[in-house]
């Protein structure tokens, strides 16, 4: 990369949202749903310019006539044709750039299957003809964004949650814990408990309304039992929400019962450790000498960590699990919704990083396997 003027592109593909923009920027230019929609029925009116597929916000707005699919499930790409459509949309419609003119930094889930990162590499070089590319692990990028190289990242998005211990910039694969419980499950759970209150939300369109209720009104209780008692004895915790049709609904203990399932997955009928235990368990899988550094640098990342009260609750829960003298610090940066992208933006604009790119030439010489040697 002799020409320093070329800005790298940074694309963070999440299960729920795709974040994209230019390296060196402090926030992504484009944030849109990772959805591809196809018409349910053949168009009646000929020449209406009906496309065979829609991506992102356009798919979302036409969701009434489309079947919506998420090509990324639980953080991992499962449908490559649709994924290609999302990347195409990202470059040409959202960022309006020619991918053959810019290096591209992509992100991947921790423990992403090897074949997947090879496929990503192949599509970038062969379909989009990028001059150079790199694949970064999401949690590691979040840690960089917080200005650290050692710590444990609790990254929780729409499709999956990971506890990832990182030492001197390297994720420790043997200690990474994955939890298939994230934003989408919480939205579904809120739909369920609102139904018990007598409000019915069933369709995919209504699910988006519930997601908005979740994002605007939910919070994490410091003491769940005590909060339940408060909610039962007074209406101080109740909030109202106006639906698109003007109807107003009231929501009470659902506000904190919904995110409580992050700490008590049994609420969702799941037999697994909550986010506090998985974080503690991941720390315990690490070498005894580095645990102190992990406890003192526990970084929250991703949209599902945006609930008010979550950092205080994590602090309380981990303090009760850890040795009594241990110093525990939970770091919750305000921009953590986008910290993976921000970390990618920082990394791709470092002068020391420029020799890390996989170039088209290296790819042509070595094939997709090069990604395992250069990105770790």
Swiss-Prot record:
Its EC number(s): 3.6.4.-
GO molecular function, one term: hydrolase activity
Subcellular location: Cytoplasm, Cytoskeleton
Gene Ontology, cellular component aspect: cytoplasm; cytoskeleton
Xref: InterPro entries: Actin, Actin/actin-like_CS, Actin_CS, ATPase_NBD
Annotated Pfam families: Actin
Keyword field: ATP-binding, Cytoplasm, Cytoskeleton, Hydrolase, Nucleotide-binding
Keyword Coiled coil: no
Listed PROSITE patterns: ACTINS_1, ACTINS_2, ACTINS_ACT_LIKE
Catalysis: reaction(s): ATP + H2O = ADP + phosphate + H(+)
Annotated function: Actins are highly conserved proteins that are involved in various types of cell motility and are ubiquitously expressed in all eukaryotic cells.
Family, per entry: Belongs to the actin family.
Stated name of the protein: Actin
Gene: ACT1
């Amino acid at each position: 990369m002799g020409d320093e003027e070329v800005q790298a592109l940074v694309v963070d593909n999440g299960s729920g949202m795709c974040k994209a923009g230019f390296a060196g920027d402090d926030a992504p230019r484009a944030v849109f749903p990772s959805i591809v929609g196809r018409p349910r029925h053949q168009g009646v009116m000929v020449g209406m310019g009906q496309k065979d597929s829609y991506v992102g916000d356009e798919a979302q707005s036409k969701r009434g006539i489309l079947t919506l699919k998420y090509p990324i499930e639980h953080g991992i790409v499962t449908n490559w044709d649709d994924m290609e459509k999302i990347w195409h949309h990202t470059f040409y419609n959202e960022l309006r750039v020619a991918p053959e003119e810019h290096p591209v930094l992509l992100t991947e889930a921790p423990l992403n299957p090897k074949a997947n990162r090879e496929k990503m590499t192949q599509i970038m070089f062969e379909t989009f003809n990028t001059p150079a590319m790199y694949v970064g692990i999401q949690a590691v990028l979040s840690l960089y964004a917080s200005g650290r190289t050692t710590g444990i990242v609790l990254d929780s998005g729409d499709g999956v949650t990971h506890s990832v211990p990182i030492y001197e910039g390297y994720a420790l694969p043997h200690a990474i814990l994955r939890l298939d419980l994230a934003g989408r499950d919480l939205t579904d759970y809120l739909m369920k408990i609102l139904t018990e209150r007598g409000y019915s939300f069933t369709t995919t369109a209504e699910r988006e309304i519930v997601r908005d209720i979740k994002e605007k009104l939910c919070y994490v209780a410091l003491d769940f039992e005590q909060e339940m008692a408060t909610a039962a004895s007074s209406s101080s915790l109740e909030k109202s929400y106006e639906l698109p049709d003007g109807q107003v609904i009231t929501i009470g203990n659902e506000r904190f019962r919904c995110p409580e399932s992050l700490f008590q997955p049994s609420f969702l009928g799941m037999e697994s450790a909550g986010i506090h235990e998985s974080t503690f368990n991941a720390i315990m899988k690490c070498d005894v000498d580095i645990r102190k550094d992990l406890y003192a640098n526990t970084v929250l990342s991703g949209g599902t960590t945006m609930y008010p009260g979550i950092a205080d609750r994590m602090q309380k829960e981990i303090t009760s699990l850890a040795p009594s003298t241990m110093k525990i610090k939970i770091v919750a940066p305000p921009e953590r919704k986008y910290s993976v992208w921000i970390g990618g933006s920082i990394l791709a604009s470092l002068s020391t990083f420029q020799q890390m790119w996989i170039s088209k030439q290296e790819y042509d010489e070595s094939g997709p396997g090069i990604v395992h040697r250069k990105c770790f």
